[in-house]
Amino acid sequence: MRIVWYPEAAKRLRQVVSYIQTEYGSKSCAKFLKEAYRTERLLARNPCLGPVEPFLADAPVQYRSVVVNRLNKIVYWIDGDAIEIVDFWDTRREPQKQAQQTIDSLKS
């Protein structure tokens, strides 16, 4: 399946990459990117890999999430032959707030 990154998800990924690069250096940044792209490849082969995201259960489509590492997860939904990555969450933050931000960003 093909992977489509929504602009907000790509923006959040870039923010995380920038933070890791600044705070922890190139080696840590490369390791994180390797984990993120590995997760993306796994999703392409196994679209239902992630469980249904409970904080988005009332949404009009079935959102799923998959953990990239212990601090981040990808939020996505399956649209025909495409996996639509709609957000990139920090697992340390309030999940209800992130869910609302995801819904709000999809409305605009």
Spans of features found by a protein language model:
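Basic, Lys/Arg-enriched alpha-helical interface segments
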Residues: R2-Y63, S105-S108
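Enriched for short, Lys/Arg-rich terminal
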Residues: V68-S108
